[in-house]
């Protein structure tokens, strides 16, 4: 370590917001270059390379072949798939000296597709799976959590190409199995969850989430063991309500009752329910105006904005991430004052369903109006207390399906503990996690957009079926650090630690240093990776703190006991074991322990 490019820190960096970011910087694995951009130091690269080796072994094992694409990519392929516009501000764009447009790669679907198109033209060439481990770039608005949410990151992405859908599904299952083996070998707990495909497109997708409190993703767990990202969670069909005895809808004056609380208070005072119970938030249909920001498309030469009205139960809250997932790749935000002013039919505090959607388009269905969407929790036949699109007026007993309809049913509200699972196995519970991998069945999205076709067995030209499979390599490293540490520092699994044994000599007696050097030589001769702290002018206390901070699994100390008793202390970094072993046998004991840990 006297020559290792390393500087440990005793204090947490001021802007580090999660444990992994604090410890990886303090232990000398990474250094911050700019927000969301990191420099990898020798110890960090050692761990990163070992993680990549595990990934390569498993992905090569299912027959995939490694390639390497440039990070600087031309605009044209991304225009063909509309992702030049869909990515919006989330990508780094630049021009060369000739004013040609380029981007720093956020993903490489287009390039993989074009490469196969350029080289293959027959079903005889397929199936094939290609992958790379490459740096990606995304212009994160607010980078956070160290390596977990960065603007530059390392990713393994693979793409399968098959002649039919069955082949795509088989490739998907092969990759999925490889992912499970990878995360098991990395000692990283994971949960596969059903997910939305988002801008990637395709018919099916699963995320691999590492459960931890700092995770940005919330996932739902069913008693059956199945799990869903909340964006992909589908509300079980709500049983229709018999409305045959429900009175006709009536308008009633409700002055100055614009909020849910004001509506409840006014109704309980002025219009008591006939069944004797109080009005509650769950009796109210809340109508929320949402702005949908679309990218330019075939019908619009520039980005455009659409307002929609979404009806949800009054005791629920809009979940913008869940709702936005159904509009992907468009982005959503709450309507602004300018939006509302542009539509005088939107009466603040009294917005209801009757002024929008199918019921507002007239008998011939051609009248122009905003789309009206309804949350999946609203049952057919249910009666509601809701706005009448007039100042100071609300509807009572307005029935969904009888009095008003929706253009579409959407998943709009936040899910909560106790909601029924989609598979009907019981109530849901929720955890947070970090996405460490995702697999997609892309189908024909990219092959059709980029005209990737082959001749099949019958001589017919057909589009190629594709799958996409990603692992956030640098994020995986951060997640392992996040879950493998204590209050003293990091504690790496044996197979990816920067070294397998951390040997140190303490004190001033030359005999301790000689014993440490002999141990290093014996371990190295047996193929053991050693980090040797040979620093002469550093106190034992500092050496111990550095060893615990760096996190090598086995620590061997040559010091006073070595000089006096002929023993070397061998301790496990996790604190599970510590013993003094004779200098004559210590090397073999350590070799056996390392080999056992690597089984």
Curated annotation (Swiss-Prot):
Domain of life of the organism encoding this protein:
Bacteria
Q: What is its EC number?
A: 6.1.1.15
Pfam families in the record, alphabetically? HGTP_anticodon, tRNA-synt_2b, tRNA_edit
Q: What is its main location?
A: cytoplasm
Q: Does the keyword section mention Nucleus?
A: no
Q: Which InterPro entries match?
A: aa-tRNA-synt_IIb, aa-tRNA-synth_II, aa-tRNA-synth_II/BPL/LPL, Anticodon-bd, Anticodon-bd_dom_sf, Pro-tRNA-ligase_IIa, Pro-tRNA-synth_IIa_bac-type, Pro-tRNA-Synthase_IIa_type1
Keyword Flavoprotein included in the entry's annotation: no
- GO MF, one example: ATP binding
Q: Where does this one sit in the cell? A: Cytoplasm
Mention any one GO cellular component term assigned to this protein in its UniProt record.
Answer: cytosol
> Assembly state and interactors?
Homodimer.
Q: What does this protein do?
A: Catalyzes the attachment of proline to tRNA(Pro) in a two-step reaction: proline is first activated by ATP to form Pro-AMP and then transferred to the acceptor end of tRNA(Pro). As ProRS can inadvertently accommodate and process non-cognate amino acids such as alanine and cysteine, to avoid such errors it has two additional distinct editing activities against alanine. One activity is designated as 'pretransfer' editing and involves the tRNA(Pro)-independent hydrolysis of activated Ala-AMP.
User: Can you tell me which family this protein belongs to?
Assistant: Belongs to the class-II aminoacyl-tRNA synthetase family. ProS type 1 subfamily.
Q: What is known of its domains?
A: Consists of three domains: the N-terminal catalytic domain, the editing domain and the C-terminal anticodon-binding domain.
Name used for this protein in its record:
Proline--tRNA ligase
Q: What is the lineage of its organism?
A: Bacteria, Bacillati, Actinomycetota, Actinomycetes, Bifidobacteriales
The encoding gene: proS
């Amino acid at each position: 370590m006297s020559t290792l490019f390393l500087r440990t820190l005793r204090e947490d960096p001021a802007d580090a917001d999660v444990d992994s970011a604090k410890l990886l910087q303090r232990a000398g694995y990474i250094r911050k270059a700019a927000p969301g951009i990191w420099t990898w130091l020798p110890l960090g690269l050692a761990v990163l390379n070992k993680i990549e080796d595990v990934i390569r072994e498993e992905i090569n094992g299912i027959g995939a072949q490694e390639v390497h694409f440039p990070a600087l990519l031309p605009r044209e392929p991304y225009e063909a798939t509309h992702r030049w516009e869909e990515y919006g501000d989330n990508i780094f764009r630049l021009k060369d000296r000739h004013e040609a447009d380029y981007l720093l790669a956020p993903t490489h679907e287009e390039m993989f597709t074009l490469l196969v198109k350029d080289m293959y033209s027959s079903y005889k060439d397929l199936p094939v799976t290609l992958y790379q481990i490459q740096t990606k770039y995304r212009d994160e608005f607010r980078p956070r959590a160290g390596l977990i949410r960065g603007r530059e990151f390392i990713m393994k992405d693979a793409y399968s190409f098959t002649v039919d859908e069955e082949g795509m599904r088989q490739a998907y299952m092969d990759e999925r199995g490889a992912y499970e083996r990878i995360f098991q070998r990395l000692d990283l707990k994971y949960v596969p969850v059903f997910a939305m495909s988002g801008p990637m497109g395709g018919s099916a997708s699963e995320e691999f989430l590492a459960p931890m409190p700092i995770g940005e993703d919330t996932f739902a767990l069913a008693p059956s063991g199945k799990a869903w990202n909340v964006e992909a969670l589908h509300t079980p069909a709500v049983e229709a309500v018999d409305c045959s005895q429900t009175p006709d809808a009536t308008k009633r004056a409700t002055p100055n009752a614009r909020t849910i609380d004001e509506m409840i208070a006014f109704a309980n005072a002025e219009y008591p329910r006939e069944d004797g119970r109080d009005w509650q938030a769950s009796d109210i249909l809340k109508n929320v105006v949402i702005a949908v920001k679309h990218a330019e498309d075939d019908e619009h030469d520039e980005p455009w904005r659409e307002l929609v009205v979404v009806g949800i139960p009054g005791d629920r809250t809009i979940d913008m991430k869940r709702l936005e997932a159904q509009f992907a790749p468009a982005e959503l935000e709450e309507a602004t004052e300018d939006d509302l002013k542009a539509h005088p039919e939107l009466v603040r505090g009294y917005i209801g369903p009757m002024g929008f959607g199918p019921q507002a388009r007239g008998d011939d269905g051609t009248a122009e109006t905003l789309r009206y969407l309804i949350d999946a929790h609203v049952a057919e036949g249910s009666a509601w207390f809701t706005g009448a699109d007039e100042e100071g007026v609300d509807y009572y007993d307005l029935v969904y399906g009888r009095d008003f309809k929706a253009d579409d049913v959407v998943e709009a509200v936040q899910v909560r503990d106790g909601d029924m699972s989609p598979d009907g196995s019981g109530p849901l519970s929720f955890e947070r996690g970090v996405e460490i991998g995702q697999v997609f069945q892309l189908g024909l999205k990219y092959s059709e957009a980029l005209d990737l076709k082959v001749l099949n067995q019958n001589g017919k030209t057909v589009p190629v079926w594709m799958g996409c499979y990603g692992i956030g390599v640098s994020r995986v490293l951060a997640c392992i650090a996040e879950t493998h540490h204590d209050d003293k520092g990091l504690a790496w699994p044996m197979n990816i630690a920067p070294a397998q044994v951390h040997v140190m000599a303490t004190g001033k007696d030359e005999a301790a240093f000689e014993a440490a050097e002999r141990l290093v030589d014996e371990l190295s001769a047996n193929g053991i990776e050693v980090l040797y702290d040979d620093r002469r002018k550093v106190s034992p206390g500092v050496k111990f703190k550095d060893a615990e901070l760096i996190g090598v699994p086995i620590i061997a100390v040559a010091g006073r006991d070595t000089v006096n008793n002929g023993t070397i202390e061998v301790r496990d970094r996790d604190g599970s074991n510590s013993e003094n072993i004779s200098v004559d046998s210590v090397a073999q004991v350590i070799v056996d322990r390392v080999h056992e840990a690597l089984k």
